Regions:
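Mature, function-bearing regions of proteins
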Residues: 1-65, 69-202
Length: 202
């Protein structure tokens, strides 16, 4: 409700990707500048949820939720499609390092281990809601326009892979489901696409 997400979905995704890339791999000074810019934007964003509950983008609890949902999804994808045997100690290291970015944005009590992340997500479940707006956004994402004809199939695969990575309870809340056949198509398909993408950015 506070951006041009619906009109420029790819642009919104690109800006988010640039922020994540810069704060993860960029110079400290550049990361700090981006974080301050995002914090300034957050201060201007407020509204009401569908049930009338007020919210602010700068709310520390909301910032923690967004961070944990994002990072746990990244980890789930990494474990499935890149390093299934990644040691728990390395997973914990990722969460510890990523938590610094969340804290700099204003998040509080950010979990810093895989066990703490799992506990946090479980604790948040009673507060989560799926409504018409939630389903609208999910539908928009699943039918997102591709930047080119060649990108249509890889894009569709990636979106279905996202559904496949959801915890069962989250998929049920959103009314999203992949059949066994779809999973057998999506997983090897994403492995193939990922190899091409990795080669293209080397």
């Amino acid at each position: 409700d506070h951006s041009n997400f619906r009109e420029d979905m790819l642009g919104r995704l690109r800006r988010t990707s640039q922020f994540i890339s810069a704060t993860t791999f960029g110079a400290t000074r550049d990361a700090e500048r981006l974080i301050e810019r995002v914090k300034h934007i957050h201060l201007q964003v407020s509204g009401q949820a569908s049930d009338g509950t007020p919210y602010e983008a700068s709310d520390p609890q909301l910032l923690t939720w967004v961070h944990v949902a994002e990072c746990s999804s990244f980890m789930a994808a990494h474990l499935r499609y890149r390093r299934p045997g990644l040691a728990v100690s390395e997973q914990d290291r990722y969460y510890r390092e990523a938590a610094r970015i969340a804290a700099a944005l204003g998040a509080r009590d950010v979990p810093t281990s895989s066990a703490a992340v799992a506990d946090y997500l479980q604790a948040q479940r009673p507060q989560l809601r799926s409504d018409e707006r939630t389903r609208e956004v999910a539908n928009l994402l699943l039918n997102a326009p591709a930047p080119s004809r060649l990108a249509r199939l890889p894009g569709a695969l990636m979106m279905r892979a996202g559904i496949d990575l959801l915890p069962d309870w989250a998929a049920q809340m959103l009314g999203l489901h992949l059949s066994t056949l779809q999973r057998h198509i999506v997983r090897p398909g994403v492995h193939g696409v990922a190899k091409v993408l990795r080669a293209s950015v080397r």
